[in-house]
Amino acid sequence: MANTDKFEMIAGMYDTPERIYIAKISSDAIRKHVADAKGKHAIDFGCGTGLVGMNLLDAFGSVLFLDTSPNMIHQVRAKIAELGIRNADTLCFDFEQESPADLRADHIFMAQVLLHIPDVEPVLSRLYDVLNEGGHLLIVDFDKNEQVVSDLVHNGFDQGELADMMGRIGYRDIRSKTFYKGSKIFMGQDASMFILDARK
């Protein structure tokens, strides 16, 4: 994934109070879409240190924490071991480079991940292939924000344009809404976050 080198460097100090707070808001939004997932397998895609997925372990039968950064995965493994978690596993893998042959999931969720992926359509297409029939992809990210100028990330996403792209891939029943607005939460700018729920 783009910016992997940056995440490798900051993995050990990633869990700041601000990130923990945003992760809680994100996981609460995701939880509202997975009420019937107790026996299901989920992937926390681009999991970082697992801040979002750790909040959702009780919502699923099992969770695979997946990231391109070995140091981030190391942080997740340490948390799993320390807390004695039994329904979680980890995988270090880059979806931008290749497609996993045997990976399957009922739910995939990704929070503040898409903005770090330069070319999002191929990755969303590969995630579609990973989903079981009827499975859900849940995306939490920032609404498009013209105040954000960066060479490292997208400046958010237009929900309609993202939904159109996903419809072309094959996703259906696509629903999205803005659910949170915060001060200086996106590259130092005031911003809003949306959640998108799409089904295979």
Feature map (PLM): residue ranges:
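Class I SAM-dependent methyltransferase SAM/SAH-binding core
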Residues: 43-97
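Core SAM-dependent methyltransferase catalytic element
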Residues: 182-200
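A conserved beta-strand element that flanks and buttresses the S-adenosyl-L-methionine
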Residues: 109
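A short glycine-rich, Lys/Arg-flanked "PGG" loop and its adjoining helix->strand segment in the class I
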Residues: 121-133
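Short catalytic micro-motifs in class I SAM-dependent methyltransferases
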Residues: 112-113
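Conserved S-adenosyl-L-methionine
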Residues: 171-182
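Conserved class I S-adenosyl-L-methionine
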Residues: 1-37, 75, 138-163
